[in-house]
A protein has these predicted regions:
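Alpha-helical transmembrane segments
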Residues: 59-67, 115-132
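A helix-boundary/kink motif common to multi-pass secondary transporters
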Residues: 68, 94-99
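Transmembrane alpha-helical segments of multi-pass transport proteins
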Residues: 78-82, 93, 129-177
Length: 177
């Protein structure tokens, strides 16, 4: 059951990240105008944040059911501290993108804590497999996002340009995954 739920989390996370990456800027450009677009680097980091959050959602559910909250409490505390410290360091260098990078790093620390609890208590011996699957998922995510973005970049702008982009986002990630 765990591996099926983990796969579902990945499929949903990769779809959400790819959809944001391909649709966010064109939608905002059509709605608010090009002048109000965020930097593409911000959109990419935002997509990674969504991916990290959704990808380990089921792992988090398993971890919550297991209890043993004391085992990963320091990961949570570390996550908050790292987020705060990195935000102060990265914001002056990268503006709002820097603060979001700090959040992605913090979410990865929380993810690591959940991995530790679940694979110590529930899935003993499966950690290497989980890490290999996550590495493969990350490569596949890059291909999905990059491939979909390359196709969408050839689409016309404006409101009508969103229609073929939506079709690309609905098809390409699902075919590649």
């Amino acid at each position: 059951v765990f591996w099926g739920m983990d796969l579902f989390s990945y499929l949903f996370a990769s779809f959400v990240a790819t959809a944001y990456f391909c649709l966010f800027q064109p939608f905002m450009g059509a709605w608010m105008g090009e002048r109000w677009l965020l930097p593409l680097s911000f959109v990419l980091v935002f997509c990674l944040n969504e991916y990290v959050g959704w990808n380990h959602r089921m792992l988090g559910s398993y971890r919550a059911v297991l209890g043993h909250f004391e085992q990963d409490q320091w990961f949570m505390v570390s996550s908050a501290a790292v987020n705060l410290i990195l935000s102060f360091i990265l914001f002056p260098m990268f503006d709002i993108t820097g603060a979001l990078i700090a959040t992605v790093v913090a979410h990865c620390i929380m993810w690591a804590g959940r991995v530790v609890v679940v694979f110590r208590r529930y899935m003993a011996g499966g950690l290497a497999h989980y890490l290999a699957v996550q590495a493969l998922h990350l490569v596949t995510l890059a291909v999905c996002m990059g491939g979909s973005y390359a196709i969408c970049a050839r689409m016309p702008g404006g409101w009508l340009g969103l229609v073929p982009r939506v079709l690309v986002v609905l098809v390409v990630p699902n075919v590649l995954n």
